[in-house]
């Protein structure tokens, strides 16, 4: 019987815990939830484990405050970091880039621990600002670039397709598109490669309407923060789990993700959202 895969999620907050929920519900892999808050990962892991008889999954789910129990993970999802919260003095929300100083220290320490205990793992970075945190993980881990991948385009693409489906009143299953570039204002949706049941989207709506959808997609994270007072987590977790599934099942799915470029697309030494083939070992060539 083949050994079950093992996925560690660092950061047991909203995104991390929701990702753990869906990994368990899909029976993908054993799960280790890690957080610095004592009791929180243990409690969430136990709560999730108690759902097993209802959902029908049969996995080992552990919550911990140390990294020893994460040893030999196949995939490590890093969600740890300071979230986007309203400043009580200014009433403003920080941009992703304003989080870089604090989160680079957090992600750096997490990455060093992960690399120590799971030297063969694929790292899926979710912490913001995404591109900068991917650089931190690459530098601190010493891993080859193929094993560092950022969750960016998968979420942005999901938002883009959702807004198109809402505008046209069609099933999201019939909308196909892709969002590349940076995670945030620098994202680049591809209108001429967007279709609904094979019909180019610009034959179904005018350019002004599509441009409004693109702008809403760029501001999608901020829209959720403005409504909730904190970052969204259902869609980010779902996008993350789609990447984890592709890796642990070696699906070789093409998923837009932040990858470290060394000459591809004319760019060097930076992380950018591009179409990548995700499978066992991380980013491959198909």
Give each language-model segment a name.
Residues 25-30, 142-144:
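Conserved S-adenosyl-L-methionine
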Residues 141-147, 155-286:
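C-terminal substrate-binding/catalytic lobe of Rossmann-fold NAD(P)-dependent dehydrogenases
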Residues 34-73, 82-91:
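Conserved N-terminal Rossmann-fold NAD(P) cofactor-binding segment
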Residues 16-17:
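N-terminal Rossmann-fold NAD(P) dinucleotide-binding loop
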Residues 12-13:
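Glycine-rich Rossmann-fold phosphate-binding loop(s) that bind the pyrophosphate
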Residues 80-81, 128:
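Short glycine-/small-residue-rich Rossmann-like dinucleotide-binding loops
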Residues 91-161:
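Rossmann-like NAD(P)(H) cofactor-binding subdomain of soluble oxidoreductases
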């Amino acid at each position: 019987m083949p050994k079950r895969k093992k996925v560690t999620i660092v950061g047991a907050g909203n995104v991390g815990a929701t990702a753990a929920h869906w990994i368990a519900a899909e029976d993908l892999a054993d799960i280790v939830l890690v957080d610095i808050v004592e009791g929180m990962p243990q409690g969430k892991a136990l709560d999730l484990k108690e759902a097993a008889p209802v959902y029908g999954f049969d996995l080992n789910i552990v919550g911990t405050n140390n990294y020893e129990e994460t040893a030999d993970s196949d995939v490590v999802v890093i969600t740890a970091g300071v979230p986007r919260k309203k400043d009580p003095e200014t009433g403003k929300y920080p941009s992703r880039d304003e989080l870089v100083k604090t989160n680079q220290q957090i992600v750096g320490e997490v990455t060093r621990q992960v690399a120590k205990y799971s030297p063969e793992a694929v790292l899926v970075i979710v912490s913001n600002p995404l591109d900068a945190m991917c650089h931190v993980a690459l530098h601190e881990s010493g891993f080859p670039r193929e094993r560092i991948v950022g969750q960016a385009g998968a979420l942005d693409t999901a938002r883009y397709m959702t807004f198109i489906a809402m505008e046209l009143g069609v099933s999201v299953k019939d909308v196909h598109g892709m969002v590349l570039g940076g995670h945030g204002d620098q994202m680049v949706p591809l209108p001429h490669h967007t279709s609904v049941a094979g019909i180019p989207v610009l034959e179904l709506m005018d350019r002004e309407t599509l441009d409004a959808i693109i702008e809403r997609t760029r501001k999608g994270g901020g829209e959720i923060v403005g409504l909730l007072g904190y970052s969204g987590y259902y869609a980010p977790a779902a996008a993350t789990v789609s990447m984890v599934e592709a890796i642990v099942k070696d699906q070789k799915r093409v998923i837009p993700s932040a990858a470290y470029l060394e000459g591809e697309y004319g760019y060097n030494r930076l992380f950018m959202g591009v179409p990548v083939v995700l499978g066992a070992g991380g980013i491959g060539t198909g």
